[in-house]
Amino acid sequence: MARILIATDAWHPQINGVVRTLDMTARMLRRLGHTVEVVEPSLYPAVPVPFYPEIRISLPRPGRVYDRVRRFRPDSVHISTEGPIGLLVRRYCRLRGWRFSTSYHTRFPEYLWRLARFPEGLTYWFLRWFHGHSCPLMVATPSLENELKSRGFRAPLRRWSRGVDLSVFHPRTKPLDTYPRPVLLYVGRISHEKNIEDFLRLPTAGTKVVVGDGPARAELTRKYPKVVFLGYRQGQELGEVYSAADLFVFPSKTDTFGIVVIEALASGLPVAAYPATGPIDTITHEKLGALDDDLGRAVEQAQRTGDPAACAAEGQTYTWENCTQQFLRNLVPVSVRSTPHG
């Protein structure tokens, strides 16, 4: 069994796809008998991100991070994020001559441009540098792999998909008296970079339901009083919300995968989305939903052609066990000649 160190700037209590992916992967690795150390923000002092105060970024002293890595004596190192913790663990590996893997979870260039007008080109330059010595760089989808190649990323790319907890996300009998039908559902961060208003402004029948929180929630609650904002939901409570809906709408154009899409499928919900990275790799035929540059048309088509049984069957193919096996196959020993714990 291996000693695996995962470095991440995203961890609990944040609620997002990156944290869910890393948390489930660490759980599965431990279940398989591996020893896992997660170097994460709660271990160090942190400050809120200026334009996104609900997210805190850690500011660790380098020596504290280096000591933690050295004491753990990893067989493999995976660096999951490009923030201060990721940078320090990357630097430690480079100083030691260790090999390491990384992963590309978040479209920071697009987000930073949208939130702070920071030039995309500069952020992509930084990301090419950060991942330049990865062996390999893990990506979730074929379309993201092709995009990173086209943007000049030179590290070897390997696939690392995502999973669904099928004990939580599965079809249930729909309640009869929830909201006027059809119920159109969005689950995710309530922020402008998620393009959520493209969903909220659609002139659809029935009820729009939003699960999640974020910096734009107060503004959008006032602007769209007919929309039901439920706040955060987790676990079985979230699974029940999915299965009570009729259609899942995913308006984001900047996600790298969209775990919520496969959670919706596993719950028996067709998906309406833009033909963007993530949905374009997942919604592969009309029974699963519809993709269109006009989100309203995608909603109409998904309501016509979506098949809940086909959606549930497709969602069941995304398991965390399979994802974790992919992750394990992609890991590299810190040194070609290293012996365990040496």
Annotated model-derived regions:
Residues 176-209:
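Conserved donor-binding/catalytic core segment of Leloir-type glycosyltransferases
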Residues 253:
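Aromatic "clamp/platform" in nucleotide-sugar-dependent glycosyltransferases that forms part
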Residues 218-236:
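Nucleotide-activated donor-binding/catalytic signature segment of Leloir-type glycosyltransferases, i.e.
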Residues 124-172:
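Donor nucleotide-sugar binding/catalytic pocket of nucleotide-sugar-dependent glycosyltransferases
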Residues 305-337, 341:
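A charged, aromatic-enriched C-terminal amphipathic alpha-helix characteristic of glycosyltransferases
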